[in-house]
Amino acid sequence: MEMANDKVAETVIVGNYVEMESEGKPPQDIKSKLSNFLWHGGSAYDAWFSCASNQVAQVLLTLPYSFSQLGMLSGILFQLFYGILGSWTAYLISILYVEYRTRKEREKVNFRSHVIQWFEVLDGLLGKHWRNVGLGFNCTFLLFGSVIQLIACASNIYYINDNLDKRTWTYIFGACCATTVFIPSFHNYRIWSFLGLVMTTYTAWYLTIAAVLHGQVEGVKHSGPNKIILYFTGATNILYTFGGHAVTVEIMHAMWKPQKFKAIYLLATLYVLTLTIPSATAVYWAFGDMLLNHSNAFALLPKSPFRDMAVILMLIHQFITFGFACTPLYFVWEKTVGMHECKSLCKRALVRLPVVIPIWFLAIIFPFFGPINSTVGSLLVSFTVYIIPALAHIFTFKSSSARQNAVEQPPKFVGRWVGTFVINVFIVVWVLIVGFGFGGWASMVNFVHQIDTFGLFTKCYQCPPPTPSVPTMPPHQMNATAPSPHHHHH
């Protein structure tokens, strides 16, 4: 690294952030110290917690299902591969953010009560068509991200208390999640993201240890990968796992020194890999092909206090992740209605309510936990998180003057601008073909199959069939996530 250049860049950037830092130090009495510690987070650690905890939530439970579709080796390789791709695009987003912010602050724009979002970065650097595309994909993705959290809540609690069916649980959790309208911004998620990380860590190790202690099921088969359709569905679910950074810009904005963000995302991803690889491998090793019909890993493990604990922790975590996915939507909505700069919390909370209602509704229509992850992954994450940032980076720095005046030069080990350009083009092509093309096709076929099998407003997705005294559908149709041999779709 050329130290001199870095030093200059750093002073330029730090110069702009001085005012933000001085804001971040209110007078310290005990009460404000405590509220600061629990509530107002903007340090590098907070960003790390937010990234890591935001990345893993319910995906831990669907990864073994992906492994059963992909086979062991592909599963591990895809995780590493998409982990690296994800960190790279997060790095691009952070560069574009710092670039946008520095340009704006040279024009003396003040961002005190305004949260910068991804679409504004696109707007400022590339104009309004980019903004509209970015906004469209991002909002749809976050909308469905929130929907998935709701479905996951219902899907999980069912394993503790099955007196109510999953749809009723979705109603209940929808009402609970609506309370996130009262959390003003990402600064206020400090204690939550820390707890979230503790919870996912516990769950991941619970899955690993429980699966190993349980040992392999009799006659366990590991036949994956056998169907091309399932292979790509699984791969896309992994793409979705490491595409958790549609919220990257908002998390960065909540930091006091956003330029530290680049390394943080990579570290978060590395930590996440230590959770996802052991747990998915262990569960797949123990249960093999049984996972093809159980997209939620909790379904196969024996009931125990530890499992109940893991389920409860995941529930609390989903609540937090719901807040994470929804907060940017609230911001966009506030800006549309013109209430974003408003000081009164209650007014803003009221304005935000219409955002929660469609999410609630969608979660009741499509309760397919597992297949919906892959569908969202292929159709939305592929663009929001991989293709758009890579293209935006190419177009922002395509003129040589823009490259010379860039606040931050690309690192030497990737080969400066040429290397960066090559990597970006590779990402765009790869994700378009494998993620969006094959992945989209496979996920949509799988998704439509779920609708054909279960119907839209299905009451209880993948629940064990009721007692045999009532004539029911044959069991293989009740819980088919993979097309069963009786009815092939070609």
Swiss-Prot record:
Carrier protein involved in proton-driven auxin influx. Mediates the formation of auxin gradient from developing leaves (site of auxin biosynthesis) to tips by contributing to the loading of auxin in vascular tissues and facilitating acropetal (base to tip) auxin transport within inner tissues of the root apex, and basipetal (tip to base) auxin transport within outer tissues of the root apex. May be involved in lateral roots and nodules formation. Pfam families: Aa_trans. GO terms for molecular function: symporter activity. Its main location: membrane. Residues 74-75, 154-168, 212-227, 284-310, 374-376, 442-490 are extracellular. It is a multi-pass membrane protein. The chain crosses the membrane at residues 56-73, 76-96, 133-153, 169-189, 191-211, 228-248, 263-283, 311-331, 353-373, 377-397, 421-441. This is Auxin transporter-like protein 5. Residues 1-55, 97-132, 190, 249-262, 332-352, 398-420 are cytoplasmic. The keyword Glycoprotein applies. Shoots and roots of nodulating plants, at low levels. InterPro entries: AA_transpt_TM. One of its GO terms (biological process) is amino acid transport. Belongs to the amino acid/polyamine transporter 2 family. Amino acid/auxin permease (AAAP) (TC 2.A.18.1) subfamily. It is found in: Cell membrane. Glycans are attached at N293, N479. Keywords: Amino-acid transport, Auxin signaling pathway, Cell membrane, Glycoprotein, Membrane, Symport, Transmembrane, Transmembrane helix, Transport. The keyword Cell inner membrane does not apply. GO terms for cellular component: plasma membrane.
